[in-house]
Amino acid sequence: MSKTVVLAEKPSVGRDLARVLKCHKKGNGYLEGDRYIVTWALGHLVTLADPEGYGKEYQSWRLEDLPIIPEPLKLVVIKKTGKQFQAVKSQLIRKDVKDIVIATDAGREGELVARWIIEKAKVTKPLKRLWISSVTDKAIKDGFKNLKNGKDFENLYHSAVARAEADWIVGINATRALTTKFNAQLSCGRVQTPTLAMIAKREEDIKNFKPVPYFGLRAAVDGMTLTWQDKKTSQTRTFNASVTSQLAGALQGKPAVIVDLKKTAKKSFAPGLYDLTELQRDAHKRFGFSAKETLSVLQKLYEQHKLVTYPRTDSRFLSNDIVPTLKDRLEGMQVKPYAQHVARILKRGVKANKSFVNDAKVSDHHAIIPTEEPLALGALSEKERKLYDLIAKRFLAVLMPPFEYEETKVFAEIGGETFTAKGKTVQSQGWKAVYDFADEDDDEEEKDQTLPKLAKGDTLSVRSLTETKGETKPPARFNEGTLLSAMENPAAFMQGEEKNLVKTLGETGGLGTVATRADIIEKLFNTFLIEKKGKDIYITSKGKQLLELVPSDLKSPALTAEWEQKLSGIAKGKLKSSAFIKEMKEYAKQTIREIKSSNQKFKHDNITGTHCPDCGKLMLKVNGKRGTMLVCQDRECGHRKTVAKQTNARCPVCHKRMELRGHGEGQTFACVCGHREKLSVFEKRRAKDKNSKASKRDVHSYMKKQNKDEPINNALAEQLKKLKLDQ
């Protein structure tokens, strides 16, 4: 009997598919049943070969070897996951296997993961496609009843290959050229470089900003505060100090006369459902999660707990075919604290509308919403609960009536000058009943008040007149949340660019994709092009210099717009990938010529007096997310060591987080308040604390892990939190 291989992207999804398809026989990297063999990748198992794969001469980075443009680009098995590739291949080539179901993530990258494996295995069997947005049993069963023809996704695959090859051709060549030309570890790319340029522009805007003072006037009357309004501009502030100071004197002792009351019934609708970027923004704003951390937690909610739909979506809408499933999803989350809201929605009846259901605004995947899986909050970690709560409340909110209120605008005159106040009377909480936080987006200077009973013609005595003043503020520095927003909508950083390119970036979702933006930000941190101070992101000297060295069009989002426009054309079958790749090769050659002819120099302004123990050259001091490091300036040497690490250990004096400095016996905790404490003293102090759950072994284990130079934004910090070291 012939069988079908089902290729998943990850083991966890593979196990779910195998369970539904009744594949219980365990093999080496696969599960087998009567009809199906389920196997899985581990993300990418196959990738494009590095330059040294085309010849030993490319093992050394030399400017004279550039550009490197192999014909054709070769695929290689990733060494780290080579065993799993062989396990997958052995199933694909079986004689009893008649066809293959691609069950990797439903999107451009998922298509590439599977197709590259199949191509490298030299298998040409018929392909079918599983295209689902959640991995619940019901979704899997429905998906297998409606498998799509693999040929329908050929263009999507060609688009994915074109993107990967273009990134290789431009990225590899530009990075090697910059690094060898300026003898510094420099990298660039079509997404990371314009992202860095946006951070630099924001820094420049802040630096050049000149604050302008402004002035206002407030009148305190019985039961409310009135705000002066300029009759000419209708503004509640002026940049002329003499205007308000003269008014404050002239209006003293004069009453306020109510000249008009305007009452307006208003409705406020719930914010849209979450796509990945919006969820990352909110999670950073409310919980301080990094973009990568949010995606990691979300992936667990999707794969492990099966409580939410596909995470890497760029849509904030649902398609019409999802509407009949909304009732089941609501019933799955009928536990506290959501049960009362679910009951109210079900009693009223589930009503969909165009504000969140629109087929035209759903491409590969709909918005992130709960699945019908029964909710067990006790099985979730604290972070998983927080993230699920955001998704659940947003889902409930769009299914609830609008928030309704009556807005009252008061117009009064004092000595012929106009003063205003406004108040709000809630008629129906609607969707706001789901939330227990106040509006955070109300930035208006004139706040809503609880107004007394008033009538037109009323005369009120003015108890006091107060002059107010402030200054215009510079643009805020980026944090990870606002940087994600800028990457999604970079139009403000494309002044002077063609309108069609700005429009394209808007249509294609900006710089990068929902799935790659977190990694791009992380790479900028890891390569020390940007750094964090608190939550704010700053460009480093290295980042500023890099932008001076790269060709100008690599800094503009317009390059990404042009590429995405063409990649979209390839995916739709309107453009041949070969024409696009030919253009990218010419672009790479031009970029190399520009870099080679540059007369600029790169200056290490973070050089120290410490010599590298491996090569003897002076080392550079760099600030990472987890602390301070010394890195050898010789890129080929690559020696690095951590000299100060940020920890979660709290200072016994001010309770702020302490930094760990030094090595071995001499390691010392240091705090910004001036407190110093040797590691040995720290251990003794904690050992005395009978209530602490941190044993000496716990502390030593933590310190051992701290010494590893791991990528930033890892989970190490979480370990110390659990040890209760802030007692």
UniProtKB/Swiss-Prot annotation:
Domain of life of the source: Bacteria
Coiled coil feature spans: none
SUPFAM superfamilies registered for this protein in UniProt: Prokaryotic type I DNA topoisomerase
InterPro entries according to UniProt: Topo_IA, Topo_IA_2, Topo_IA_AS, Topo_IA_cen, Topo_IA_cen_sub1, Topo_IA_cen_sub2, Topo_IA_cen_sub3, Topo_IA_core_domain
Enzyme superclass (EC): isomerase
Named cofactor requirement(s): Mg(2+)
Enzyme Commission number(s): 5.6.2.1
Binding site for Mg(2+): E9, D105
GO BP annotation list: DNA recombination; DNA repair; DNA topological change
Pfam families in the cross-refs: Topoisom_bac, Toprim
Composition skew (Basic and acidic residues), residue ranges: 685-711
SMART domains linked: TOP1Ac, TOP1Bc, TOPRIM
UniProt entry keywords in alphabetical sequence: DNA-binding, Isomerase, Magnesium, Metal-binding, Topoisomerase
PROSITE patterns: TOPO_IA_1 (PS00396), TOPO_IA_2 (PS52039), TOPRIM (PS50880)
Region entry Interaction with DNA, spans: 187-192
GO-annotated cellular components: cytoplasmic replication fork
Domain Topo IA-type catalytic residue range list: 153-592
Annotated family: Belongs to the type IA topoisomerase family.
This protein's name: DNA topoisomerase 3
Species in which this protein is naturally found: Bacillus licheniformis (strain ATCC 14580 / DSM 13 / JCM 2505 / CCUG 7422 / NBRC 12200 / NCIMB 9375 / NCTC 10341 / NRRL NRS-1264 / Gibson 46)
The gene coding this protein: topB
